[in-house]
Amino acid sequence: MLFSMESILSSTKPKLEPPPKLEPEVTINEQVVDLPRSNTRLSEPSTSASVLEHDLKFGESRKRSRSLGDEPTEDEDGVPVRKANKRNHSTSSAADSSSDDAKDDDDDDDSTSRKSMSGHRKSSHAKPPYSYIALIAMSILNSPEKKLTLSEICEFIINKFEYYKEKFPAWQNSIRHNLSLNDCFVKVARGPGNPGKGNYWALDPNCEDMFDNGSFLRRRKRYKKNSDTYHEMMSHHPMPFPPFLPQGMPFPPRMMHPMANIPMLGHPMNPRAVPNMPAFFIPQNIDSQKLLSMMASRIMPMDAPVSSGQKRTSSSSSPNENGSSAVSDKLSA
């Protein structure tokens, strides 16, 4: 049996197996790396399509809720909207209420401005050529009892003149002021059997001829209370002379005769004060207000009070005087 060297060598040499190929592992790694890239590339159109579908569905649901009057529960970002809508509704209602209040205030201002402008707007009737004093006197003289209240005077003027009817009540305060400031009008109190609101007003008996021959267009003279009323008051005064007489005031006739000495109940408060009555002399027509001011200015001041320093000096000097007098008494003894 023949053996060749090649067969012997081949039998003695170990058979070498080829190393395992790593290509499948590399392909697996490539697939692992490439799969997310392919997924992300494919997921982008899918996500955009899903977002579009979500927007379309949200828009349709929102339109349906608006048509049905319901409010959406979520916003575009998925945030609940119901509370925000409630807050917006409350703020809108508060704004509406404030606007309503502002409208009401505007209406009130308009009404007050209309009332205030009623006295300034032009009237279709001409203004009567009478003063307020003439109107008041006219109404009082045309009344049966010759006395009227403020409301009755205004009622007479309104019924008599259309001009004042349109301007009422803008001129009512003028009537009130003329009644209280003019001496020709006298206030008459209501009797016990005549209850009601407000006093009566009448003309002073001395000013009935204030207007010429019953014409109220012009007053003949301006009525003013005379100062003779003061002399009449003094003539009926219980005391023979008033407590204070101003300088320039004449003696009443009753002071010309001598008066009896009035007994005093106690010592005078200021015995050093000697009454120094100046020479009295006169204006005939003197106003009552001026008279009162003159009487107040002529009150004689009292003696000035002694200061504390003088009191101290007098008190300190008194013991010295007593001591000196005691010494002189001893020496004389």
UniProtKB/Swiss-Prot annotation:
Region span, Disordered: 1-126, 304-333
PANTHER family documented for this protein: FORK HEAD DOMAIN-CONTAINING PROTEIN FD3-RELATED, FORKHEAD BOX PROTEIN
Keywords, sorted A to Z: DNA-binding, Nucleus, Transcription, Transcription regulation
GO cellular component: nucleus
Alphabetized SMART domains for the sequence: FH (SM00339)
InterPro entries attached to this UniProt entry: Fork_head_dom, FOX_domain-containing, TF_fork_head_CS_2, WH-like_DNA-bd_sf, WH_DNA-bd_sf
Tissues where the protein occurs: Expressed in ventral body wall muscle. Expressed in the structural cells and two neurons of each ray in the male tail.
Entry annotated with the keyword Hydrolase: no
Residue stretches of biased makeup (Acidic residues): 98-110
Compositionally biased region (Basic and acidic residues): 14-24, 52-62
Name of the featured protein: Forkhead box protein unc-130
Subcellular location(s) of the protein: Nucleus
Entry GO MF terms: DNA-binding transcription factor activity; DNA-binding transcription factor activity, RNA polymerase II-specific; RNA polymerase II cis-regulatory region sequence-specific DNA binding; RNA polymerase II transcription regulatory region sequence-specific DNA binding; transcription corepressor activity
Superkingdom field: Eukaryota
DNA-binding span(s): 127-221
KO phenotype (gene knockout): RNAi-mediated knockdown resulted in de-repression of unc-129 expression in ventral body wall muscle (BWM).
Amino acid composition bias (Polar residues), ranges on this chain: 37-50
Gene: unc-130
One annotated GO biological process: axon extension involved in axon guidance
Protein role: Probable transcription factor. Binds to DNA sequence motif 5'-CTGTTTCA-3'. Required for the migration of distal tip cells (DTC) and axonal growth-cones along the dorsal-ventral axis of the body wall, acting by cell autonomous repression of unc-129/TGF-beta expression in ventral body muscle during embyogenesis. Binds to the promoter region of the unc-129 gene. Plays a role in dorsal-ventral patterning and fate specification of the postembryonic mesoderm. Involved in male tail morphogenesis and in embryogenesis.
Low complexity compositional bias, start-end: 307-333
